[in-house]
Amino acid sequence: MNFIQSIHPAKPLRYLKWFDILIITVLMFGEFIIRSTQQFMESLSPSTVASVAETTTNVASDGAAYSSNFTFQLMMLGITFLYLLIRNYDFKQLPIRFSWSVFIWVPLIFAIVGIFGDIVTTLSGEYNYFNPQLIPFIDPMEIIRKFMSLTPMAIGYALLNGFYEEFFFLGLLTSVKEKHQWLVLIYSVIIRISFHTYQGLLWALVIGLVYGLFYYFLYKYVVKNLLPFFLMHALADMFGSSLLYLLITWRT
């Protein structure tokens, strides 16, 4: 009886144990960490840089890849929920609620993340988004045009992935005792970085360290609602972490 109760506590489980976090990490991100690490290691070889970049681009734009990831993540999410149900995790403690403030927080957070992304892109020499010659091509209506050009699968996958990642990082990884929160925060940064290394070390650090900490402190001490982060992350998956790219008309 004691063994069964240790697995499935009588009272709802508010604080996850270290083994809960490790098991859920492997379930939700183990495969993606392996894939990302493999692509990153391949990119370090000069002879494979071009092929890796081409493969990454093709995967990102391929509907079949969206469908494959969608199915896999849905399956892993289902297994994770089953595990949490067995552990009698207290889902009610997660603040997921719709309010009018969501319509403010989502675009505001996306804009902050997007502008920072544009600064990083410009300073790294990838592309100068702050070139004055781009000003005439800025059109807010471009947001609608770019959204309308997305496929239903791309939108569906972005929504799923936004929930998938932030449910883990901001939801589950904050379900720990206060004395462990800083250690778990460091752990969350490492995990965020580890499955984004396929984008290059610079962007893996930006996403994992800068964005990860920004999301955490904003959620924990200001917003206190997971929904805006689910939706904002979905927008970033749809359009990338760039505000100016979204606003600029690129058609000639």
Each model region followed by its residue ranges:
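Short, Lys/Arg-rich, polar N-terminal cytosolic tail immediately upstream
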Residues: 1-13
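Membrane-interface elements of multi-pass transporters and channels
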Residues: 37-48, 86-90, 119, 123-131, ...
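Juxtamembrane helix-loop-helix connectors linking adjacent transmembrane helices
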Residues: 44-62, 89-161, 250-252
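Alpha-helical transmembrane segments in multi-pass membrane proteins
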Residues: 17-88
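Alpha-helical transmembrane segments of multipass membrane proteins
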Residues: 27-35, 72-76, 109-117, 121, ...
